[in-house]
From Swiss-Prot:
Enzyme class: transferase
Topology of this chain in the membrane: Single-pass membrane protein
Source taxonomy: Bacteria, Pseudomonadati, Pseudomonadota, Gammaproteobacteria, Moraxellales
TM ranges: 8-28
Organism the protein comes from: Acinetobacter baumannii (strain ATCC 17978 / DSM 105126 / CIP 53.77 / LMG 1025 / NCDC KC755 / 5377)
Pfam families: Transgly
Gene Ontology MF, one: peptidoglycan glycosyltransferase activity
Protein task: Peptidoglycan polymerase that catalyzes glycan chain elongation from lipid-linked precursors.
Family stated for the protein in its record: Belongs to the glycosyltransferase 51 family.
Pathway membership, UniProt: Cell wall biogenesis; peptidoglycan biosynthesis
Keywords: Cell inner membrane, Cell membrane, Cell shape, Cell wall biogenesis/degradation, Glycosyltransferase, Membrane, Peptidoglycan synthesis, Transferase, Transmembrane, Transmembrane helix
GO biological process annotation, one example: cell wall organization
InterPro entries: Glyco_trans_51, Lysozyme-like_dom_sf, PBP_transglycosylase, Pep_trsgly
Name of this protein: Biosynthetic peptidoglycan transglycosylase
Amino acid sequence: MKAFIVRVLLIFIGAILFIQLWIFSSLVWWRTHEVDTTMFMRIDYWSDTSEPIIHEWLDYDDISDNFKHAILAGEDAKFIHHHGFDWDGIRFALERNNEQGEVVAGGSTVSQQLAKNLFLYNKRSFIRKGQETVATWMMERMWSKRRILEVYMNSVEFGKNLYGVEAAAQYYYGKSAKNLTREQAAFLAALLPDPKYYQDHRNDRKLQYRKRVILRYMNSTQIPE
């Protein structure tokens, strides 16, 4: 019995180490190569294979600065200054969730969201959150802020099977993300809390309010050079 328990523990530890090695090697590769697909994209596609994934990579310098400012205003205003975790944001989210008695605020940074999208599944659990923390820690030490934001903008979801700002700009406005105006950039950034819903409800009051807030604060955000 003791030998069996030891064997199970060794297998469990080996699996954990293998996952960390996979994440580490992937981050090394993606430092200099485009991210063609993410775990989030694959899971989304496997759940409904009737429609293809729409995704097109665009280099950082070819993405409108309007969108860079908008996405940080909407998702992570302290992106430049933290090391992967916004402790004030996490504390605020916990307080709001406690007040409401349910999860109404997240507090995840761009880095945390990207780590989850690249490697993990969407269902909340302590195991997933722990692995997200480890992957975020690795990413922040291996990639520049510029690279993190570049990959995030190219992999985040904007609607059903619609990923990356270039695909979103073409879908919603028929233009490249390089040419997004302030209004257009703010709208795309405002979609992110629930892109599949807002894709078909573009005049939703919450969406329009979020867009106005992003427009108000986007010029105050600092983006990587």
